Amino acid sequence: MQIWVGLGNPGAQYAMHRHNVGFMAVDTIAEVHRFDPWKKQFQGWSATGRIGNVKVLLLKPATFMNESGRSVGEAMRFFKRETGDVTVFHDELDLAPFKVKVKTGGGTAGHNGLRSTEAHIGNAFRRVRIGIGHPGHKDRVTGYVLGNYVKAELDPLAGMLGAIASEADWLASGDDARFMSEIALRLAD
């Protein structure tokens, strides 16, 4: 079993924040791949299903971003999984909007959800970095990531989330390069 975690903040008021794009990604995966309904579990919401022939637990921590690692660690221990079985979907300031990159390990780049996850499970987990762009100056970062997507961004956002979900088979099978290239091809059209 793989554990795929979407990072975000719980609550309707945060639903369309750029910082919640990880939640949006796993919600779209659950819908496209017809996962079981979400249930309250592991200090968050979880849904199980299959992507290809791989069993996947989707997880949305309800602990708020800064404590996400508590939820991830609890799920990992319950299923007796290793850090390498965890994939975290998160917003990435250092990528252009709607670009998607995958890497394993690395630093947190100041992302509190990643920092918390690393503190609880180590840093050898896979990250699906979802580009939100940078507002230009570090003083504007907090307002930007905690701001809603604007109307002009909604179509590209939906296209990117759909591509992530549609190409998730590659991610589940461990072909990160193919996952990224197939998403790029879909978004180039």
From Swiss-Prot:
Matches recorded under Pfam families: Pept_tRNA_hydro
- Which reaction equation describes what this protein catalyses? an N-acyl-L-alpha-aminoacyl-tRNA + H2O = an N-acyl-L-amino acid + a tRNA + H(+)
> Where tRNA is bound, by residue?
Y14, F64, N66, N112
A GO cellular component annotation here is:
cytoplasm
Asked if the keyword Lipid biosynthesis belongs to this entry, the reply reads: no
Under which EC number(s) is this enzyme classified?
3.1.1.29
| MF (Gene Ontology) | peptidyl-tRNA hydrolase activity; tRNA binding
Chief location bin: cytoplasm
Q: Which UniProt keywords apply?
A: Cytoplasm, Hydrolase, RNA-binding, tRNA-binding
Give residue numbers for the site Stabilizes the basic form of H active site to accept a proton: D91
Q: Which GO terms describe its biological process?
A: protein quality control for misfolded or incompletely synthesized proteins; rescue of stalled ribosome
The protein's enzyme class = hydrolase
Active site as annotated: H19 (proton acceptor)
Family under the similarity heading: Belongs to the PTH family.
Q: How does it assemble?
A: Monomer.
Q: What does this protein do?
A: Hydrolyzes ribosome-free peptidyl-tRNAs (with 1 or more amino acids incorporated), which drop off the ribosome during protein synthesis, or as a result of ribosome stalling. Catalyzes the release of premature peptidyl moieties from peptidyl-tRNA molecules trapped in stalled 50S ribosomal subunits, and thus maintains levels of free tRNAs and 50S ribosomes.
> What is the protein name stated in its UniProt record?
Peptidyl-tRNA hydrolase
